[in-house]
């Protein structure tokens, strides 16, 4: 760790080599985290920003690249956290568990006035990802942005004409009150931002600018849809256009035609849009499941504009979805079978995670996750090898190496109350993708070709979503609800995978070892 060490000299080189000219950065870059006032929906508030913008700048690279992202913490605002971490959502971090970014699982936070270099490779991954703070609810205050790893040999390349920085679409919930100053569980966002712009339906809002996405009639576009949400899921659609899904969270899938996509916090999809309609303006809609749930006056909206169309707001009308995305229709393009034997419990280790809530905290198997003062990775490197020795007590599960694992998430109702209110809860597993052998809304198991992803909705009452993965990546990996307010209330566990080989598989840099002493020395006002 260093004081504001800079990589700007190599940033210019990497940008010139990548040829991407729409403001993207990476794979070698500085990423400065600072406070600034922003007005994305007509209301001004102080925020935590990456690169001085919301959402944070698009970070790009190619399959096989080494990413070297130097995070510089310039945070000073007393109403929000001054320390930070960055998680690279969906990146496996094989051999670099220390760079996964989950505070108190994989690292101590970066102290204000300091920097830390995240250095990792993506040898076997390509697709649509994102990055965000993984310290308490900090990303709800603005520290979130898209990450794309391009594949020069993309199997789907023949299906589209355009795939660049202009075809990334982020969906965000936005709050006018800093996360630590507001309620523990907000009733809903104040607005929804599409690529950083939206409208607030309350006092002081009005007809603010909306994001305009421009297409040329006759071309086919690969849009990369990224939910950088803290809480709500969105129903996404584009008036007058169908979408063909080809990628789910960094995994290529068979082409699937839909006219709406329900997308949960942390999820990503690539879809092909054929710009085959008349030259005009069309509403893009992203309706959240909480807060304002319509599009009156252009809230929850952006604009799809064909080249040469008049620069006015659309007059198109929403229609009832007739081919909405159904998760069980998604089929991986390569190696589609789930790990293990094709039967219930046909794995090396199966477990059920039972949820509960006491009014202020969430529990998994009767334990609420309380961040330890010593990161789980550091505990393992210091000699702790079994669950009984690892903190937080009851929230760390050791997993054997090279084994098939099955996890079930039963959602039940007792005396009229859900075991975990605020459903549906999207659960994200770090360090892996998994096969969803039973999806929300389904009572059947699919072992032959289930969707493969890293973030899944666990559904509603009566659901028992079940996932499978293989333990081929030593280290501690977070499994948690991606509704960030729920995570902050303890809705998480850690899988300590192959603890015996964690140290040899994940050599840590000196700068990582310096993080905890620096953070632990901070005054409470600088945390």
UniProtKB/Swiss-Prot annotation:
Annotated Cu cation 1 binding sites: 87, 428
Keywords of this entry: Copper, Disulfide bond, Glycoprotein, Lignin degradation, Metal-binding, Oxidoreductase, Repeat, Secreted, Signal
Subcellular location: Secreted
Names of required cofactors: Cu cation
GO cellular component labels: extracellular region
Molecular function in Gene Ontology: copper ion binding; hydroquinone:oxygen oxidoreductase activity
Binding residues annotated for Cu cation 4, in chain numbering: 425, 481, 486
Claim: Signal is one of the keywords in the record: yes
Glycan attachment residues as annotated in the record: 74, 77, 156, 209, 233, 242, 276, 317, 358, 366, 393, 402
Catalytic activity: 4 hydroquinone + O2 = 4 benzosemiquinone + 2 H2O
Domain Plastocyanin-like: 25-150, 162-306, 373-498
Comment on bound cofactor: Binds 4 Cu cations per monomer.
Top enzyme category: oxidoreductase
Positions annotated to bind Cu cation 2: 89, 132, 482
Keyword Nuclease tagged: no
Signal peptide: 1-23
Chain's role: Lignin degradation and detoxification of lignin-derived products.
Sequence similarity: Belongs to the multicopper oxidase family.
Protein name, UniProt field: Laccase-5
Species name: Trametes versicolor (White-rot fungus)
